[in-house]
């Protein structure tokens, strides 16, 4: 089962996305702050991190750099989520992000369909096992 750490300061977005990911067959843990994300990444060793860019205390780019600097978390794939324009996408990729998704295009109003489709493709590219529920289109 693919383990995902979802990091976003919006409780609503975390809950809605966590439910959709769990229904699709992913194992999910969540964090609302950057420092909590770093701790959970070390403890849970997720396969993938969905990381918001605007976090309180420690920004998404700071979290990304800290993850990639730590040998224990450096190999975890990080997908950047943001409500901002993708101006900085190439810099974030240079810092270690494997993909960049705009929150406005995630389909939160439709059960996160767009996110789940994009995530299934990213999981395939990373050669992780797509959950059976996701592969079946649930």
PLM feature segments, named:
Residues 56, 74:
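The feature encodes the CheY-like receiver
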């Amino acid at each position: 089962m693919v383990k995902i750490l979802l990091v976003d300061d919006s409780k609503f977005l975390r809950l809605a996305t966590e439910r959709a990911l769990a229904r699709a067959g992913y194992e999910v843990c969540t964090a609302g702050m950057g420092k909590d994300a770093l701790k959970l990444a070390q403890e849970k060793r997720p396969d993938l991190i969905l990381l918001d860019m605007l976090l309180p205390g420690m920004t998404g780019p700071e979290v990304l750099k800290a993850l990639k600097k730590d040998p224990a978390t450096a190999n975890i794939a990080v997908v950047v989520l943001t409500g901002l324009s993708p101006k900085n996408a190439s810099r974030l990729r240079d810092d270690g992000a494997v993909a960049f998704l705009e929150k406005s295009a995630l389909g939160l109003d439709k059960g996160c369909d767009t996110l789940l489709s994009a995530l299934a493709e990213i999981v395939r590219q990373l050669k992780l096992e797509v959950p059976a529920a996701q592969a079946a289109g649930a």
